[in-house]
Amino acid sequence: MVKNAFISVRVQEKKEKNSGSVEFQVFRFTNTIRRLTSHLELHRKDYSSQRGLRKILEKRQRLLAYLSKKNRVRYKELISKLNIRESKNR
């Protein structure tokens, strides 16, 4: 992933006022997941990072499941905006 993409994400994070919203949390987890994925491409045997990545993926999946139950429209907008695949269970 390109470093400039992370910089633009950081700027968006600072502009966001409601850091407790589900959308913002999913956005932050997605950014962290992408960063860890690019790290693991270089360091395949970094098992601590692999474990952390799995934990963050699970947290994001739980938040997305919650959002899809509460507001399906916001869920669809978020996954299309962040380019995330929809869960198989939904």
From Swiss-Prot:
Would the keyword Kinase turn up in this protein's UniProt record? no
Q: Which Pfam families match?
A: Ribosomal_S15
Q: Which domain of life is it from?
A: Eukaryota
Q: Name one GO cellular component term.
A: ribonucleoprotein complex
- Major place of localization? plastid
One record GO biological process: translation
CDD domains linked to this entry: Ribosomal_S15p_S13e
Establish whether keyword rRNA-binding is in the entry.
no
Gene3D superfamilies in UniProt: S15/NS1, RNA-binding
* Compartments reported by the entry: Plastid, Chloroplast
InterPro entries assigned to the protein according to its UniProt record, in alphabetical order: Ribosomal_uS15, Ribosomal_uS15_bac-type, uS15_NS1_RNA-bd_sf
This protein's UniProt keywords:
Chloroplast, Plastid, Ribonucleoprotein, Ribosomal protein
Q: Name one GO molecular function term.
A: structural constituent of ribosome
Family the UniProt entry places it in: Belongs to the universal ribosomal protein uS15 family.
Oligomeric state and interaction partners are given as: Part of the 30S ribosomal subunit.
The family database entries (PANTHER family) matched by this protein are listed as:
RIBOSOMAL PROTEIN S15, BACTERIAL AND ORGANELLAR, SMALL RIBOSOMAL SUBUNIT PROTEIN US15M
In its UniProt entry, what is this protein called? Answer: Small ribosomal subunit protein uS15c
- Lineage of producing organism: Eukaryota, Viridiplantae, Streptophyta, Embryophyta, Tracheophyta
